[in-house]
Structures are given as structure tokens and as C-alpha cells.
Amino acid sequence: MKILLTGFEPFGGDDKNPTMDIVEALSERIPEVVGEILPVSFKRAREKLLKVLDDVRPDITINLGLAPGRTHISVERVAVNMIDARIPDNDGEQPKDEPIVEGGPAAYFATIPTREIVEEMKKNGIPAVLSYTAGTYLCNFAMYLTLHTSATKGYPKIAGFIHVPYTPDQVLEKKNTPSMSLDLEIKGVEIAIRVAQSALHSSQLR
């Protein structure tokens, strides 16, 4: 079973993105995981993500993103076919009111077991919630493209997106901004992978 786990480069003036550390840690810890870091660029992220999906042909894909201001790990349920960039990407581009895929469905639902993932995280002491908006920036963009590839090409078999909060070192100069330890974020994403693996394995046995 092949699992593609993606994160993003830093953006929006931050000098780090914890998803890079999560991807690195779990790529080393879980043999089935292939880790990739996507650029915060609508043009380059599209090119890289679609190429990686074609090259790896994963059974499971979980895209990760940083959500400044969120208090919990957020397991996203839906991606919409809309780009409405609130800030420029790292190439200085700021597209608005554009579809991700011309003529594509208005939205896709995550196909990983989102509720089960959240419940398992909570059982392990990790603050987690279901989320119904992945935004209209690069995170939603990656989630939609992955699910569109799944729907049109058959791989990955299941996919979804997880947002993580800032880590404590990122909020030292940001008053009243929530954070979560990197270790807890890594543990949460590892749980998500294990739950997704189990769900896919069970479905293949039916």
C-alpha cells in the first residue's frame, strides 16, 4: 500500500511551516509513506502535485496544510472548485473567482474516514475537529486537485486534507494566537494514516 503525504512550504511571511516537519518525520517512520513538499504557488503546485500523483499512483493521499489561528487539528470534509486567494502566493500571484478545474464538479467530499479519524485523535488526547471549509487558497486547491484526480483516474483510492495549527515557536511574537506542539501534530497525522489504512484494507476485503 502506497501513501502520499504532502505538506507546503512557508507562506504569508512565516519562516517555517510545520507540515514540512510532519511529512519528514512520518516519511521516515512509516515505510509506506512517500513525502512531498508542495510550493505555495498555484501554477507550480498544480504541476508538482499532478506529476507526483501520476508517478506514485498512491492508494491513499493525505494533504497537509497550516491554518494560522486554528486551535485544533482540523480534518477537512469538502473541497470546492474555487480559487479566491486572500493573499498572493509565493510567486506574487493572487487569482480570484477562478475555478480550479474548468468544468469540474462544484465540490468533492473527502474519501478518507474523516469522523473516525477525529474520534481516534480525541481518544489519544489530541484536540481535533471536523471542518467544513478548507478555504479557497492553496490548501483547498491541493485537496480539490487530489480528489479530482482520484475521481477521474482512480488513484488515489481515498484522499483527504488535514489542517494543523501553528507550533509554539511560531507564536512567540504573536499574541493571543493558539498553537500545538509538533509532536502532537505528528501523532495526530500518524493516527489519520493508520485509520485510513485500516479503512481501505477493510473495504478491499469485502
Curated annotation (Swiss-Prot):
Cellular location(s): Cytoplasm
One Pfam family recorded for the sequence: Peptidase_C15
GO cellular component, one term: cytosol
EC number: 3.4.19.3
UniProt GO molecular function: pyroglutamyl-peptidase activity
Keyword Protease: yes
Keywords: Cytoplasm, Hydrolase, Protease, Thiol protease
Listed Gene3D superfamilies: Peptidase C15, pyroglutamyl peptidase I-like
Primary location: cytoplasm
UniProt xrefs under CDD domains: Peptidase_C15
InterPro entries: Peptidase_C15, Peptidase_C15-like, Peptidase_C15-like_sf, PGP-I_bact-type, PGPEP1_Cys_AS, PGPEP1_Glu_AS
Residues at the catalytic site: E76, C139, H163
Biological function: Removes 5-oxoproline from various penultimate amino acid residues except L-proline.
Family statement drawn from the similarity comment of this UniProt entry: Belongs to the peptidase C15 family.
Complex and partners: Homotetramer.
Protein's name according to its UniProt entry: Pyrrolidone-carboxylate peptidase
Source organism: Pyrococcus horikoshii (strain ATCC 700860 / DSM 12428 / JCM 9974 / NBRC 100139 / OT-3)
